[in-house]
Amino acid sequence: MPITPDTKDWTWVLERPCTECGFSAADLDYDDVPALVRANAAAWAPVLARPDAAVRPDDATWSALEYAAHVRDVFRIFNTRLGLILGEDDPLFANWDQDATAVAERYNEQDPQAVAAELAAAAASVADAFAAVPPADRQRTGRRSDGARFTVTTLAQYFIHDPTHHLHDVAG
């Protein structure tokens, strides 16, 4: 049975804490984001070493491997989006269908150790990118096609919720 696509607009996490994982963007200091990314990436290695990493807990839920592959791609996508904000004036981000990507890239058939290495590399890259943004550039903006607008700061806050939430999903 295929996974039901997630169609929620998760930008609400910028306004109130996530009741599922406890993350609170409003309480997050921008300068903490790089360390949070690195800590999150490190926590995925033991999750991916589990013998059941590719086993879905039920037909409607991704396996830990699928969540990790998604997080790897989130790190890559947000690195690209941050680069766009810093390099262009109010860029429009390309749409990304995470569910179509999971199917097309066969997340659950990927090698867990390869995903762990790729996730760590992508995390290091996006952590370094967020760390390198000077305070004067943190109000630069970008937008999604649905009209959601982000500053560098709110992009960081919105972004870090995703890997945090998914680590909670797999109880990592």
Tell me the role of every PLM-derived stretch.
Residues N40, A45-V47, A102-R140, F159:
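Acidic/histidine-rich alpha-helical segments that form the ligand environment
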Residues M1-A39:
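Terminal targeting/low-complexity segments that flank the catalytic cores of oxidoreductases
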Residues M1-E15, D52-A102, R138-G172:
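Short, contiguous alpha-helical
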Residues V33-W62:
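A glycine-rich, hydrophobic loop/mini-helix early in the fold
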Residues A25-A35, E88, E109-A117:
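Solvent-exposed interaction patches of small proteins and small membrane subunits
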Residues T19, D29-D31, W44-A45, Y67-A69, ...:
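Short secondary-structure boundary micro-motifs
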Residues T19-F23, D99-Y107:
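A short small-residue
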